[in-house]
């Protein structure tokens, strides 16, 4: 969308109403260290030779930039979080932990699944717990922490919770006791496996953001180089001529405190 054409349309609409000035005053667009088209790509103005920020300054349009910390370097690369990623917890031997989970899941298929009625629709009871296989398949595809959190929160957790609750409701007697004893052994082992994958995903994200900081630091004042990557990314945007406001979603106290530092 051409900003200059939008301004022309606003002026035409105002003139059609007998008004001297239009009410088009604010533009919002994504911008971050990777997606800087508003600053560097001439695609609007006279002969399409001006950038969005240049036209915005000339026309008196306020520019709000969003996604300052969630970059999409390419269409296929997914989201790159421009923030530091502290490594939490101890490393997990994935192969060994996967074998432990696989053994428990095989025990479920032999001892518990046969007691469950198969409706013939949807997933068979024997396939309710196959995370050792699924996580082994998914592991090489994990791009980073943001990607892993999507997998964990949207695919793994909903399925596991739904199945756990359903079996706890429907099994009774000896079968229920057997299920509960197995569940109490299985859940901690599955969580350990998930924690190991989370750490691996964090390490992948950290490798990417470390390279970003290394490229960015020589361009920053020395006093800024010791700050977090998220602060550096926000400072760059907030200091860019033509950017009126940087919109940053802050879902925790730590996010707020980190972001407030750039206002000092």
What are the residue ranges of the model-derived segments?
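Beta/alpha (TIM)-barrel catalytic core signal, keyed to glycine-rich beta->alpha loops juxtaposed to Asp/Glu
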Residues: 1-264
């Amino acid at each position: 969308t051409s900003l200059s054409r939008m301004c022309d349309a606003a002026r035409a609409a105002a003139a059609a109403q007998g008004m001297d000035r239009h009410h088009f005053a604010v533009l919002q667009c994504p911008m971050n260290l990777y997606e800087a088209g508003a600053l560097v790509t001439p695609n609007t103005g006279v002969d399409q030779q001006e950038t969005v920020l240049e036209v915005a300054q000339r026309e008196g349009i306020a520019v709000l930039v969003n996604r300052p910390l969630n970059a999409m370097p390419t269409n296929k690369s997914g989201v790159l979080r421009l923030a530091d990623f502290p490594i939490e917890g101890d490393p997990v031997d994935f192969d060994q932990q996967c074998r432990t989970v696989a053994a428990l899941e095989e025990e479920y298929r032999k001892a518990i699944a046969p007691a469950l009625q198969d409706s013939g629709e949807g997933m068979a009871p024997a396939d309710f717990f196959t995370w050792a296989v699924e996580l082994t398949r998914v592991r090489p595809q994990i791009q980073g922490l943001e990607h892993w959190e999507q997998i964990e929160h949207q695919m793994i957790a909903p399925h596991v919770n739904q199945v756990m609750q359903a079996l706890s409701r429907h099994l009774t007697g000896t079968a229920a006791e057997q299920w509960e004893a197995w569940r109490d052994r299985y859940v901690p082992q599955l969580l350990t496996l998930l924690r190991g994958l989370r750490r691996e995903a964090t390490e992948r994200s950290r490798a990417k953001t470390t390279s970003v900081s290394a490229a960015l630091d020589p361009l920053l004042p020395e006093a800024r180089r010791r700050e977090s990557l998220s602060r550096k990314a926000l400072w760059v945007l907030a200091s860019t001529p033509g950017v009126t406001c940087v919109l940053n979603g802050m879902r925790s106290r730590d996010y707020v405190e980190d972001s407030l530092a750039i206002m000092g």
